[in-house]
UniProtKB/Swiss-Prot annotation:
The lineage of its organism: Bacteria, Pseudomonadati, Chlorobiota, Chlorobiia, Chlorobiales. Part of the 50S ribosomal subunit. Belongs to the universal ribosomal protein uL22 family. Keywords: Ribonucleoprotein, Ribosomal protein, RNA-binding, rRNA-binding. CDD domains: Ribosomal_L22 (cd00336). This is Large ribosomal subunit protein uL22. InterPro entries: Ribosomal_uL22, Ribosomal_uL22_bac/chlpt-type, Ribosomal_uL22_bac/org-type, Ribosomal_uL22_sf. The keyword Cytoplasm does not apply. One of its GO terms (biological process) is translation. It comes from Chlorobium phaeobacteroides (strain BS1). The keyword Nucleotidyltransferase does not apply.
């Protein structure tokens, strides 16, 4: 049985978030938490929050199973592009430059390493 957690409208560019997501893709949850704790990327805090939420969703969805962090692994993790906010920056000679403030949606799906019966 798998569980999912989604973090929407994160004010980070999808490119930066995908770097962190690639670090933990396919890893066990305890290994992924260790990697995220030692990561210097700012996006790792958001990924850690969502990962903890996915694990909590799994335990809520399956109250009869006792799956710890070493029993779960990250089955899927992907980052989609969110809405882009456009701003104008004054430029020389009466012009204006467009600034695009990007956002993203993060989805994490966790599952058990060995199916528990």
């Amino acid at each position: 049985m798998q569980a999912k957690a989604v973090l929407r409208h994160t004010p980070t560019s999808p490119r930066k978030m995908r770097i962190v997501a690639g670090l933990i893709r396919g890893k066990q949850v305890d290994q992924a938490k260790a990697i995220l704790m030692n990561s210097t990327k700012a996006a790792s805090r958001n990924v850690m929050q969502t990962l903890k939420s996915a694990v909590a969703n799994y335990s809520q969805k399956n109250p009869d199973t006792r799956a710890g962090d070493n029993d779960l692994f990250i089955k899927e993790i992907f980052v989609d592009e969110g809405p882009t906010i456009k701003r104008m920056l004054p430029a020389p000679m009466g012009r204006a430059y467009r600034i695009r403030k990007r956002s993203n949606h993060l989805t994490i799906i966790v599952d058990t390493v060995n199916p528990v019966s």
